[in-house]
């Protein structure tokens, strides 16, 4: 399964909202469709969002019918702004937008700028693929033979447009014949763990158990879990990390049980412009994601719902960051 593919100036994405029941690929024909796919989680995971954003901007730029920079620039800025507004938390999205904006700011010929934007999007895609492969290799070195590793949400190939970050670490350790196994949390409310991580672990042949989010502490107390590895959507300068809601709870539980808690993320997820997690904008999503399940209401009508998509794990709870440049241990 390929999450994202750029083919003949068309963006092909796998609709992740339908998995694992249906494997359906969508051909996106304009940047509005790309923006909508990001908003609705048809494409998701911080690195994949960044890649899709870059292609979406390239898409939009190719559709601008002018050869004059004075006419091209304001239309391009509208496209860039729409893509940037899709989701507020993932750093990779804004990294991609900034890189594409820089290409435009550096150009003087509209045709050449369009070509350069496509080239930059492809470059971002290849960089994320390569980064996830290196992350997986470095991270596998931390996993001891026979360990059971817990992961949360989905940080595999579907989320990274490549090999995977947190899930890539687990898969790489398995491929090294270390005899490891995994626990995957279902990840309410959108069940990325049950729908996506379970699918990827199954396809990779990794022995695993799917559990509800609230079971993690029980299995840690029983001594079943040896490490926790998660991905990230944005990492502040001090190491505070935003990731899927429920990550912070797992980090607290891991600390209480003496279990190392690792964050696997590419350098594109690190945001040096913000000092701490207090500065990270947390996306609030629709209440229907909690009150409905697969189109069926599961909660009473007319109730208040809180639905933050992410939480922030303080840096002091994280044993190490696994990046494409190596391992960064706490305090380094």
Swiss-Prot record:
Binding sites annotated in the UniProt record for substrate: 44-46, 87, 192, 243-244
Function according to Swiss-Prot or TrEMBL: Catalyzes the interconversion of methylthioribose-1-phosphate (MTR-1-P) into methylthioribulose-1-phosphate (MTRu-1-P).
Chain positions of site Transition state stabilizer: 153
Organism of origin: Dehalococcoides mccartyi (strain ATCC BAA-2100 / JCM 16839 / KCTC 5957 / BAV1)
Catalytic residues identified in the record: 233 (proton donor)
EC main group: isomerase
EC number per UniProt: 5.3.1.23
Biochemical pathway: Amino-acid biosynthesis; L-methionine biosynthesis via salvage pathway; L-methionine from S-methyl-5-thio-alpha-D-ribose 1-phosphate: step 1/6
Record's protein name: Methylthioribose-1-phosphate isomerase
Superkingdom per UniProt: Bacteria
InterPro entries attached to this UniProt entry: IF-2B-related (IPR000649), IF-M1Pi (IPR005251), IF_2B-like_C (IPR042529), Initiation_fac_2B_a/b/d (IPR011559), M1Pi_N (IPR027363), NagB/RpiA_transferase-like (IPR037171)
Biological processes annotated in GO: L-methionine salvage from methylthioadenosine
Gene Ontology MF terms in the entry: S-methyl-5-thioribose-1-phosphate isomerase activity
Keywords linked to the UniProt accession: Amino-acid biosynthesis, Isomerase, Methionine biosynthesis
